[in-house]
Amino acid sequence: NDFIDRNIDSPLNLLTPNLARLIALGGFRKLQPKVNQFLKDPRLQKVYSFQAMYAGVSPQQALAIYAVIAYMDSVNGVFFPKGGMHAVPRALAAAAEKHGVKFVYNSSVTSLEKNGSRVTAAITDKGERYECDAIVMNPDLPVVWKELLGKEPLSIKRLKYSPSCVTLLVGSSKHYDHVAHHNIHFGDSWDGVFDELIKKKTLMSDPSVLVTIPSHDDKSLAPAGKESYYVLFPTPNLDADIDWKKEAPRYRNEMIRVLESRGYEGFGDAIETESMTTPLDWQARGMERGAPFASAHTFFQTGPFRPRNIAAGFDNVVFAGSGTQPGVGVPMVLISGRLAAERIVGPVK
């Protein structure tokens, strides 16, 4: 609760007994050495440290505090919503509508009306005007500033971004008995591929990949006798010198080759429908540098040093999403929504 579940306005807010305990446990040391201190099997070392990649840093550079992600996975398990991940926002919307919230879909905010330090109305691409007492904004922060609020603050311009990824969503006729719902397939290389991804900003020569099979536990997510696959390969973000318009077809074939070499025999031939998302697609969806994991969780972009959820220079503009506090990931983003609401109506009792 001290570090994630509340609004933090200053590093001084963290000066609690829990901070002292965290320091004593080595939470501000590096993740990989800390994991290696307790786990000696190289396979387990990977399992309990790879999550740093999604925070935008290598396990060798990430803070040991991020071991909490693997801890939660191990102790609490990994949950899957019936109906797929989209069931979560559908349920949230239904609960909000029950309490009088009105949603306007397929409509984009293109400009804001301002009066001094307050935003007074949002204007959509359809010419609709919505007056507001306060406004919560959840696009990536650089996009919000450049396209809606005005001059981008220097603190936002200086942000360093996480790697990106390519995803392949597949409808397939192929079933594999040896796989689970969530599968992580590590390459033989470890430190080297993180250097490729983060420092050299090149494609990983021996990638570690995620394969999720939603239909493994929810048969409604694929036709009878079929399977649905979500495949994720980490890649550099758009700071890299990669022309994804040209690279995408070749990389799609490389992804299939890697999958087939990792035990998914005949994967390519069994594809019946597919959708590929590259860093260019993430950028088109409003994600700075084509980075779906937002700004990296380096030390000075974590906790109180991460961009606050209050817009500087405005009295009634609040942020939510992975680019602000507390950070990246579905649980964090859900918490960010509540923290944004608390900025407007006060702390939830």
What is the predicted role of each segment?
Residues 173-283:
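C-terminal segments that line or cap access tunnels to active or ligand-binding sites in enzymes
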Residues 41-55, 204-212, 265-326:
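A glycine-rich dinucleotide-binding beta-alpha-beta segment and adjacent secondary-structure elements
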Residues 322-345:
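A conserved FAD-binding loop/helix module that cradles the flavin
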Residues 1-61:
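Rossmann-like flavin
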Residues 110-223:
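Mid-domain catalytic core of redox enzymes
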Residues 136, 170, 231, 259, ...:
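Hydrophobic, well-ordered secondary-structure elements that form the walls
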Residues 46-79, 311-315:
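Active-site-adjacent "gating/activation" loops or surface patches in catalytic cores
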Residues 67-125:
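Helical element adjacent to the flavin cofactor pocket in flavoenzyme catalytic cores
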